[in-house]
């Protein structure tokens, strides 16, 4: 799905003020801010015709927003009560957040994670397990001939190996609701404080999933050591002490490589980043810098 196709879907929603909508993000989803200071934000997923789980995920994300509001967890709020399906694409509509007053940092993230990790499992709907590796095959197929078939097979092998290893893990923390992609980029700091955004990976699983993300950021994405120390001190525990961390880290690295691969057919920078990531995994070098994409 490129920007042109996403704008076609946006226009087909029939929502007002979509013609000059601002593209905020284009990755797994396309996210648009419609015109006007109070115009809603529209999130468009990839075609779900052959992947009905994408529509189910969008429906669950809207339900989650209402549930988090009931528990007074600061998070994005849906502007419509249910997800739509527009020409096969999941579409959700959200209230626009006030302008950010500053970038989010680890302290903002950890404050929200502590709230999420204290939540019970919802009773009105079910949360899935955090299937870190569930999208690998779909992403590799979208990459097609743009990537080396040997690299695709290598990632499939890693996927299978880490899936098997993850099934044997014993958590240190209680199992329960998690964000699933716990990074400062998924926190918006407005005038009233930090707000959690991008709820589609919310799951019920090991809380360690949410902590491994920052440990990986320290090694792969240039997170300063002081920032990581702030995060662990505020949370009260460093996930690197847990023996299961290398398994969850390896699974996440595998998924991150495959996720970038889906953009390779249309974006040379994505292909370069994919090759960098796969090479570092093949060489077993855990400190090669990866670039956010």
Predicted regions, residues:
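Juxta-kinase regulatory segment immediately upstream of eukaryotic protein kinase catalytic domains
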Residues: 1-20
